[in-house]
Design a protein with these regions (language model features):
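Long, low-complexity, intrinsically disordered polar/charged segments
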Residues: 133-142, 186, 211-221, 256-274
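Catalytic beta/alpha-barrel core
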Residues: 167-175, 193-200, 217-227, 243-252, ...
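Shared catalytic-loop signature of beta/alpha-barrel
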Residues: 228-245, 250-347, 351
Length: 377
């Protein structure tokens, strides 16, 4: 379901970029490291009407992907923002084409596009969910649980999230912290919706270990192999009963189509930052829906900006599995928006206000800003 009614163009006058350091409520450990502070870039599109906000979901180091904060900061200020400002007036649907000559840097492109889109929709008085074609007013909320010190600690953490009302549990795994951790959670909580996420920690040589996870009746195993291992993922998928879901490998509509053609995955995790923007994310949703492939919305520890946009995206009809659109309090004691996402009966509401549907808390934003720069025409 392509965007039915494109947004109006806006006259861009500048961009303000900020690097934020947001303390996490607890350390978040994956197969590639531990975060205690979320470093992220937020973008403010300055226009002749309402300003718009976006989020560049890079981290401090190039561990999840090749993108990282300082590289994103440089390419945004030196190349991508100036290219958009040179156009003067443009519609959100034109942002991707303007930025296409610049290779890669999808997270930066996504953040800039979202800021322009937010500004345009605020000017029109339209909500982002309406623009996307959302069919739900709230979305089921899953939670991502990092690697804990031992299986017992993991069970304690999962139990706390289930008590809060999360409807699906995802646990991070890595070699040596996979089968026993998964067994502990399954034994403790029975037939809860459960999936695991490897963040590319394995190779095809680990197929026997990964096959041991089949006995736990998981919803899926997410990104077991490296980002560029589409062929090996297809080989592994034939070996496992557990559905293989791709995350890091899906960087565009074409990558999604290639993965489906090869049989590399039977489920797709869609992250707007990873694929270059929310419009590309909608296109991947449409591709998968037409192919009968389930999708769900992944998370990148977003602030209230990206979390609101993710909720709107996850309200599309093809998102049939609970995603990582959790409450803001899962990661942050204090968010940078005035009305952070909250968990209500296992769901997060889709904002209905203009644009993103959330307003920035200027004091909270200033308190976590470590660098700020503005570029104008």
């Amino acid at each position: 379901m392509p965007i039915a009614s494109p947004a109006a163009s806006v006259a861009l006058e500048g961009f303000e970029l900020r690097v934020l350091h947001l303390p996490l409520v607890s350390p978040f450990t994956t197969s590639f490291g531990t975060e205690t502070v979320r470093e992220v870039i937020v973008v403010r599109a300055l226009t002749d009407g309402p300003d718009g906000w976006g989020e560049i979901v890079t981290g401090a180091a190039p561990l999840y992907s090749s993108e990282y904060t300082q590289g994103a900061w440089d390419v945004a200020l030196r190349f991508l923002a100036p290219a958009l400002l040179d156009r003067g007036r443009l519609a959100p649907e034109e942002v991707a084409d303007v930025l296409r000559p610049f290779v890669g840097h999808r997270m930066v492109k996504a953040g800039l596009e979202l800021a322009v889109l937010d500004a345009a929709l605020r000017a029109e008085g339209r909500a982002l969910g309406e623009y996307f074609g959302a069919v739900h007013d709230r979305v089921p909320s899953g939670v991502s649980v990092g690697i804990q010190r031992d299986p017992a600690a993991l069970v304690d953490a999962v139990g706390g999230y289930l008590d809060e009302g999360y409807v699906r549990i995802k646990i991070k795994i890595k070699p040596g912290r996979d089968v026993a951790d998964t067994a502990a959670v399954r034994d403790a909580f029975g037939a809860i919706p459960l999936q695991v996420d490897a963040n590319s920690a394995y190779t095809l040589a680990d197929a026997d270990t990964l096959a041991e996870l089949d006995r736990f009746d998981l919803l899926l195993i997410e990104q077991p192999l490296q980002e560029d291992d589409l062929v090996d993922h297809a080989t592994l998928a034939r070996r496992l009963r557990t559905p293989v879901c791709l995350d890091e490998s899906i960087v565009s509509v074409k990558a999604a189509a290639d993965a489906l053609a090869l049989g590399s995955a039977s489920i797709i995790n869609i992250k707007a930052g990873r694929v270059g923007g929310y419009l590309e994310a909608v296109a991947i949703h449409d591709l998968c829906r037409d192919a009968g492939i389930p999708v769900w919305c992944g998370g990148m520890l977003e602030t209230g900006i990206g979390r609101a946009a993710n909720a709107a995206l996850a309200a599309l009809p093809g998102f049939t599995l609970p995603g990582d659109v959790s409450a803001s309090s899962r990661f942050y004691t204090r968010d940078i928006v005035t009305e952070p996402a909250v968990l209500e009966d296992g769901h997060v509401r889709v904002p209905t206000g203009h644009g993103l549907g959330v307003d920035i808390d200027p004091i909270a934003l200033d308190d976590v800003t470590v660098v700020r720069e503005t570029i104008t025409r």
